[in-house]
Regions:
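Loop-to-helix transition at the N-terminal end of transmembrane alpha-helices
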Residues: 35-52, 56-73
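Structural signature of hydrophobic alpha-helical transmembrane segments
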Residues: 34-50, 94-105, 174
Length: 194
């Protein structure tokens, strides 16, 4: 597999949201706006790339019996660094995303890539895999958030462009499920045509 294919695989064929249906908790809860979706996606991307690099580097030295707890400690370390950075430089976004930032530690996307890819491959390939999956997750959350924001409040990335208030249901839980469901259908229909 080429380096380019490693990245595009996580974007399309193994998209964590629309194909693998992973990370549903942050997907449904944080995508009330495009900015929130983008921010959560970038936070997860940061942790994915760095944890994949670290886990790939230490994997040969980690005994099989304790590899999952070790991976969780590595992931938790990067999440803690992310929390400190967000608190220092983007306190408003940190407050908005709240509990979902520390929950990246147990996000099945991050742990799944560590277990399925990073511990069996080299550092560069693991970084590219994390980048591809992270970009796929970021793109998914941003698109879901953008659609929900447009339909729910008539704005995009915080800029109001439609008159009125929009359809309130789209910024609430039912809207999250509707938008996610329709996008999953469209995405998978697109994949089957290829």
């Amino acid at each position: 597999m080429t380096k380019f294919q490693l990245i595009t695989k996580g974007l399309v064929k193994d998209n964590p949201t629309f194909v693998l249906i992973l990370g549903m908790c942050p997907t449904l809860a944080t995508t009330t706006s495009a900015i929130n979706g983008l921010s959560m996606g970038l936070a997860t991307l940061f942790v994915l790339v760095l944890s994949n690099i670290a886990i790939s580097a230490i994997a040969p030295a980690v005994p099989d019996k304790v590899h999952i707890p070790v991976y969780i400690v590595v992931i938790a370390t990067f999440v803690t660094v992310l929390q400190f950075l967000m608190q220092a430089y983007t306190p408003g976004m940190y407050a908005t995303l709240g509990l979902f930032i520390p929950l990246i530690v147990v996000n099945c996307i991050v742990l799944g890539r560590a277990e399925a890819f990073a511990n069996k491959n080299g550092v560069i390939d693991s970084a590219l895999d994390g980048l591809g999956v992270g970009l796929g997750f970021t793109l998914s959350l941003t698109v879901i958030g953008l659609i929900r924001e447009i339909l729910g409040s008539g704005s995009a990335f915080g800029f109001k462009f439609l008159p009125g208030d929009g359809i309130l249901a789209f910024v609430m839980a039912p809207g999250a499920f509707l938008v996610l469901g329709y996008l999953m259908v469209l995405f998978n229909k697109f994949l089957k045509k290829q």
